[in-house]
Amino acid sequence: MERTLDRVGVFAATHAAVAACDPLQARALVLQLPGLNRNKDVPGIVGLLREFLPVRGLPCGWGFVEAAAAMRDIGFFLGSLKRHGHEPAEVVPGLEPVLLDLARATNLPPRETLLHVTVWNPTAADAQRSYTGLPDEAHLLESVRISMAALEAAIALTVELFDVSLRSPEFAQRCDELEAYLQKMVESIVYAYRFISPQVFYDELRPFYEPIRVGGQSYLGPGAVEMPLFVLEHVLWGSQSDDQTYREFKETYLPYVLPAYRAVYARFSGEPALIDRALDEARAVGTRDEHVRAGLTALERVFKVLLRFRAPHLKLAERAYEVGQSGPEIGSGGYAPSMLGELLTLTYAARSRVRAALDES
């Protein structure tokens, strides 16, 4: 457990560093944004953004942390302007070059992403940036914070686990650790069920997550689908999937995750996934081997916890879009909730492969 906490703590510390940074001294200004959004005051939104927009270029001493924090504070204005029917780059003089500079400095898209609005966003009431100021929005941000660092730790562990022999007792031990990390995903979806109204999400929050255009390209708005769970599953079971829709889904969100996870994705693309390697070893050795059975049993538990997240996530998304009387039928990520159903089906299929191997003995 101590190792688990240490691993998660490393990722949480990185989040905290960005969240604590206010390189544009914009905190007090950004906190005025929800009121302007309630009043649909587009000139006020533009004027407020121009008060701190670094139109003369980024300071030479800035690193990743400063650039990410600056994009966070500017980013809330981007979604706000688009919510009121305006392309931000068209109505804010000097905005587009700043966004492109920040994108280069962070190797991320030239707009706010899920990372910017959640784990890189302060949690204190007098500092947390927001589009609306609604309690449901605060709960939405918290639902992501609950699990993001644990998910990042889980990705690192999954990559390490790929090189651990199924015959080693360490394989089952690492799977148990992975299961514990992924349990935080289940906790996050339970939290969302309890505290976020589907009606409020659809009517009040969803309109702020529309795509915008920067530099001649369209960039998706922040959404929970940008969580790098798809990178973990790529390594775990999906790297050789021949499902075209699934591949397109993954590739849609690659630009929105950290460069390190794009590298992990590329490393495993077209190569055997962890499940493939483990099942090949089980076939070669036989599943009557004590450590092989223990490893496969622990691996199946990993899939069980993934399914305990995937199934309610699908139901939650369906609830949110069922309440909408008009408006978009797809999420901010560009996919309908039915895509979550396809992911659930694929996850069940992967789990079935492990169960079949256990049943052979």
UniProtKB/Swiss-Prot annotation:
The protein's annotated pathway: Antibiotic biosynthesis
Known partners and oligomeric status: Monomer.
Gene3D superfamilies, alphabetized: 1.20.58.1320, 1.20.58.480
Disruption phenotype: Cells lacking this gene lose the ability to produce pyrrolnitrin.
Species, as recorded: Pseudomonas fluorescens
Protein's job: Involved in the biosynthesis of the antifungal antibiotic pyrrolnitrin. Catalyzes the ring rearrangement and decarboxylation to convert 7-chloro-L-tryptophan (7-CLT) to monodechloroaminopyrrolnitrin (MDA). It can also use 7-chloro-D-tryptophan, but 7-chloro-L-tryptophan is the preferred natural enantiomer.
Keywords on record: Antibiotic biosynthesis, Heme, Iron, Metal-binding, Oxidoreductase
InterPro entries: PrnB, Trp/Indoleamine_2_3_dOase-like
Catalysed reactions, semicolon-separated: 7-chloro-L-tryptophan + AH2 + O2 = monodechloroaminopyrrolnitrin + A + CO2 + 2 H2O
Necessary cofactors: heme b
UniProt-listed Enzyme Commission number(s): 1.14.19.-
Gene Ontology BP annotations: antibiotic biosynthetic process; L-tryptophan catabolic process to kynurenine
Protein origin, superkingdom: Bacteria
Binding site for heme: 313
Residues annotated to bind substrate: 222-225, 321, 332
GO MF terms, alphabetically ordered: heme binding; metal ion binding; oxidoreductase activity
Family classification: Belongs to the PrnB family.
Effect of residue 321 to F: Loss of synthase activity
Protein name: Monodechloroaminopyrrolnitrin synthase PrnB
